[in-house]
Amino acid sequence: MFGLGGQELILILLIILLLFGAKKLPELARGLGKGMKEFKKAQTEIEEEFNSVVDEKPKKEKTASSTQS
C-alpha cells in the first residue's frame, strides 16, 4: 500500500489523531468511506459505458460489411 510499512501507518494515524482529536475521527472516517464509495461507483459507471461503446463498435462494423457484400 504505497510502500508504507506498519510503523509509518501508525505514525500517520497518531498525527491524524493529534490534529483532529478522537471525537472527529469517526466523522472523518465516515466521510472518507462515502467518498471512496462514490469514486468506485463513478469508476464502475465509466467502465460500463466504455465497454458498451467498445461492444457496439464491432457490431456496427459487422453489419456495415455484410450490407456491402
Swiss-Prot record:
Instruction: State the family it belongs to.
Output: Belongs to the TatA/E family.
The organism's place on the tree of life at top rank: Bacteria
Q: Which Pfam families match?
A: TatA_B_E
Q: What does this protein do?
A: Part of the twin-arginine translocation (Tat) system that transports large folded proteins containing a characteristic twin-arginine motif in their signal peptide across membranes. TatA could form the protein-conducting channel of the Tat system.
Biological processes annotated in GO? protein transport by the Tat complex
UniProt keywords (A-Z) are: Cell inner membrane, Cell membrane, Membrane, Protein transport, Translocation, Transmembrane, Transmembrane helix, Transport
**Gene behind this protein:** tatA
| Any one cellular-component term (Gene Ontology) | TAT protein transport complex
Q: Which residues form a coiled coil?
A: none
Q: Where are the transmembrane segments?
A: 1-21
- Tell me what topology the record assigns in the membrane: Single-pass membrane protein
- What HAMAP family does the database record attribute to this sequence? TatA_E
Q: Where in the cell is it found?
A: Cell inner membrane
What is this protein's record name?
Sec-independent protein translocase protein TatA
The record lists the organism as Pelodictyon phaeoclathratiforme (strain DSM 5477 / BU-1)
> Assembly and interactions?
Forms a complex with TatC.
Q: Name one GO molecular function term.
A: protein transmembrane transporter activity
